[in-house]
């Protein structure tokens, strides 16, 4: 008896289900060209519940009955999105636009969209849009959130017109011009608060919402509109409030779902849950599953369904998720099997390869081709290697390699002082001149960090250009500089002449340059002591004194600046970058050259006369010494126009007895003021506008050594006192107008070498900066 009753109930349920499906199949499927899929429906018995009833007005305009809004489109949830976020169906409706002060009146607050208790809520892709001058709009019924935005019509911002207020405001400002007509939406700007503004909705299930336009600003007139929409608005289509007001409506995206309470509709679909499907996918057993449903009983008690991957159709009608034949349709218009046979599966496909003969033929052909290509490649490599060897010999000879070898052999006691590297050694040392090995770049060349086979770390300077007419002078200069052995001068270790331009190898200084330690933010507290700065000044002065006086031939550096002063791990200074240096014979006192140097460090007398003397290096050293005392940059746009260069700033401060005001705050409290004062007097003498009144580097070096040696009651060497003539001198400085223009400049510090054989002829660097 019990068994018969169960069978009867099952038969009755099946019959009712068949009847429901039959009725559903006879229901209208479209209204006004818009698809109406189940659970939505038109007419009694054609929809799942009252929430989903669609009324087709005049057989052309569909309305969602429960909220009386025109329907634009209905779609199901996206299955692919479900594995990252809960997917919902989408129904787009037309919602009234709130307006104020427009030509034909309007709704001041708009109509309230209330879906409380319904299986609908606002999608998170909707935005609040407000259009019009001085329009402040906000959302209502979104407590505790406060959502709103304000649009203005201020024209104070200096932006291109095609990024301003769109075509309407372009015409209002410039008249009906062709330029305004040609504004392209490709160059348009999203609503940014000028003419129109936008605001995002609260990130939660919002079922009741309204739009309000603030009317407290009585002085602001003109049409203002505000609305919620899922469409994107730019200045070109969102800057005409009258046009938007005339439209009356805009589209809003609602998300819909199925209530799971009090009915077994979802269970009758035969769909798998997301959790079940995830387990099946893990075991590769997901094929054949047509639809999926996601349940949430903890918050709103809803369920959403979709067809699984490889299926399409309506998941809310049993059996309506149909398999996609990928072998016929392909994926994104492309065939799924480029080789072999495509076999369609329920929810997927596979590619079968049954005939192996083409594969064997293909492999044999490929192997033969590879052997042939390998032979050609080996022959190519052999010929290329021979060409490279011949090219290296050619470069070595052209770059003066034979002359250098001869001079190194005939120079007694200096045969091993300079090494001639081959190109392979330097390529290996720098990982084939890898970009990761670059230490710095300038107009003259690029410096790489390298490690030789003996473990020494070196700086490898690869020049950009070469003057072939001065290669002999270059070789002579290499020999001269290689003989310099001073602890405060970066050592030239050797060169490579097998490349198209000579490559120079210097010792590597690991601790950066003085500029970085003085002016860049750093955790190094060593530079906060006056003793370290004074020692650096002594080191620099000693190196320049050696170059000017003690070297076999006097050498003028010509580009002394803080970026060319390297610091080793013990913060001992080493002078670097001889790219513009010049040697002079003992019977000459100056060089006439093309002006080259760095703004802020350049001798003004040299700038005027183009005659570089040893006193020009003294001037540049004076600027560096002033940097050490003040901590200021040689050129700073933070200072006023008259004090823009440090030389002017420092000299005027010294004349006005304001030394204590300009001492670097990092050393002011811990320094010995008598030492700083003595050093400042030397810096002032070095910065004298007339070169003949400056001390020599030898005098400067001796005086700084004396300052460093005596800490109390010292009496530094006094130079001739300033006279009235100096006070009448007009400061001649390198003009610095702005951050973007400098009258004379030079490349950043790199290692390089250049020479001259005449003291009166115009000379340019071998590697121009």
Curated annotation (Swiss-Prot):
Sequence similarity: Belongs to the protein kinase superfamily. Ser/Thr protein kinase family.
Catalytic-site annotation from UniProt: 559 (proton acceptor)
An individual GO BP term: response to fungus
Domains: entry comment: The EGF-like region is specific to this family of proteins and seems to consist of the C-terminal of an EGF-like domain fused to the N-terminal of another one.
Extracellular compartment residues: 25-358
Region described as Atypical EGF-like: 291-351
GO cellular component, one term: membrane
Subcellular location: Membrane
Name of protein: Wall-associated receptor kinase-like 10
Record: residues binding ATP: 439-447, 461
Modified residues (Phosphothreonine): 593, 598
Chain ranges of the Protein kinase domain: 433-718
Membrane-topology annotation of the record: Single-pass type I membrane protein
InterPro entries hit by this protein: EGF_Ca-bd_CS, Kinase-like_dom_sf, Prot_kinase_dom, Ser/Thr_kinase_AS, WAK, WAK-like, WAK_GUB
Enzyme Commission designation: 2.7.11.-
Residues modified to Phosphotyrosine: 506, 606
Intervals, Cytoplasmic compartment: 380-769
GO terms for MF: ATP binding; calcium ion binding; guanylate cyclase activity; polysaccharide binding; protein serine kinase activity; protein serine/threonine kinase activity
Alphabetical list of Pfam families matching this protein: GUB_WAK_bind, Pkinase, WAK
Glycan attachment residues as annotated in the record: 58, 114, 134, 182, 187, 237, 262, 296
């Amino acid at each position: 008896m019990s068994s018969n009753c169960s069978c009867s109930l099952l038969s009755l349920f099946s019959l009712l289900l068949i009847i429901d499906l039959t009725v559903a199949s006879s229901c209208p499927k479209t209204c006004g060209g818009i698809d109406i899929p189940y659970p939505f429906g038109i007419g009694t018995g054609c929809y799942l519940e009252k929430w989903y009833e669609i009324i087709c007005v005049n057989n052309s305009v569909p309305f969602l009955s429960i909220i009386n809004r025109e329907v634009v489109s209905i779609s199901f949830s996206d299955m692919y999105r479900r594995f990252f976020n809960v997917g919902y169906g989408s129904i787009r409706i037309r919602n009234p636009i709130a307006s104020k002060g427009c030509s034909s009146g309007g709704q001041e607050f708009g109509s309230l969209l209330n879906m409380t208790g319904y299986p609908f809520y606002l999608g998170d892709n909707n935005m609040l849009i407000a259009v019009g001058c001085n329009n402040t709009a906000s959302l209502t019924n979104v407590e505790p959130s406060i959502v709103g935005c304000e649009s203005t019509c201020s024209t104070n911002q200096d932006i291109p017109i095609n990024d301003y207020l769109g075509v309407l405001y372009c015409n209002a400002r410039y008249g009906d011009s062709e330029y305004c007509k040609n504004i392209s939406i490709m160059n348009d700007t999203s609503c940014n608060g000028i003419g129109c503004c936008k605001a995002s909705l609260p990130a939660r299930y919002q079922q009741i919402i309204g739009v309000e336009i603030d009317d407290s600003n009585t002085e602001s007139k003109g049409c203002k509109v505000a609305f919620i929409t899922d469409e994107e608005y730019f200045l070109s289509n969102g800057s005409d409030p009258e046009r938007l007001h005339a439209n009356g409506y805009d589209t809003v995206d609602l998300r819909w779902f199925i209530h799971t309470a009090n009915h077994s509709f979802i269970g009758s679909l035969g769909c798998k849950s997301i959790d079940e499907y995830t387990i099946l996918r893990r075991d590769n057993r997901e094929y054949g599953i047509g639809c999926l449903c996601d349940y949430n009983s903890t918050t709103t008690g809803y369920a959403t369904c979709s067809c699984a991957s490889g299926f399409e159709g309506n998941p809310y009608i049993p059996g309506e998720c149909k398999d996609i034949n990928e072998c016929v349709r392909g994926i994104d218009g492309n065939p799924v099997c480029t080789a072999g046979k495509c076999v369609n599966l329920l929810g997927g496909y596979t590619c079968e390869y049954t005939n192996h003969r083409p594969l064997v033929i293909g492999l044999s052909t490929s192997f033969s081709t590879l052997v042939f290509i390998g032979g050609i490649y080996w022959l190519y490599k052999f010929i290329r290697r021979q060409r490279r060897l011949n090219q290296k010999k050619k470069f070595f000879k052209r770059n003066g390699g034979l002359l250098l070898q001869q001079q190194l052999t005939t120079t007694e006691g200096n045969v091993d002082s300079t090494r001639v590297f081959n190109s392979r050694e330097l390529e290996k040392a720098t990982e084939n001149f890898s970009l990761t090995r670059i230490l710095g770049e300038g107009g003259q060349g690029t410096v790489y960090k390298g490690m030789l086979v003996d473990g020494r770390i070196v700086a490898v300077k690869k020049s950009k250009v070469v003057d072939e007419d001065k290669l002999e002078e270059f070789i002579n200069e290499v020999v001269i500089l290689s003989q310099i052995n001073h602890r405060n001068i970066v050592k030239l270790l050797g060169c490579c002449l097998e490349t198209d331009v000579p490559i120079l190898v210097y010792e590597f200084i690991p601790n950066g340059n003085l500029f970085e330690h003085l002016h860049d933010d750093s955790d190094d507290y060593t530079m906060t002591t006056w003793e370290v700065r004074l020692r650096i000044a002594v080191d620099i002065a000693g190196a320049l004194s050696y170059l000017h006086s003690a070297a076999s031939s006097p050498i003028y550096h010509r580009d002394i600046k803080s970026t060319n002063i390297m610091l080793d791990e013990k913060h001992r200074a080493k002078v670097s970058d001889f790219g513009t240096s010049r040697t002079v014979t003992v019977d000459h006192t100056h060089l006439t050259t093309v002006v080259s140097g760095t703004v802020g460090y350049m001798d003004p007398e040299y700038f005027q006369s183009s005659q570089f003397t040893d006193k020009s290096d003294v001037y540049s050293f004076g600027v560096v010494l002033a940097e050490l005392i003040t901590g200021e940059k040689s050129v700073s746009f933070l200072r006023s126009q008259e004090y823009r260069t440090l030389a002017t700033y420092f000299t005027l401060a010294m004349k006005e007895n304001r030394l204590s005001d300009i001492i670097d705050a990092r050393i002011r409290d811990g320094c010995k003021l008598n030492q700083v004062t003595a050093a400042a007097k030397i810096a002032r003498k070095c910065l004298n506008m007339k070169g003949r009144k400056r001390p020599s580097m030898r005098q400067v070096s001796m005086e700084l050594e004396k300052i460093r040696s005596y800490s109390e009651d010292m009496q530094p060497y006094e130079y001739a006192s300033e006279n009235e003539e100096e006070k009448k001198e007009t400061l001649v400085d390198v003009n610095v107008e702005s951050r973007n223009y400098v009258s004379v400049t030079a490349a950043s510090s790199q290692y390089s070498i250049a020479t001259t054989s005449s003291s009166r002829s115009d000379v340019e660097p071998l590697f121009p900066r």
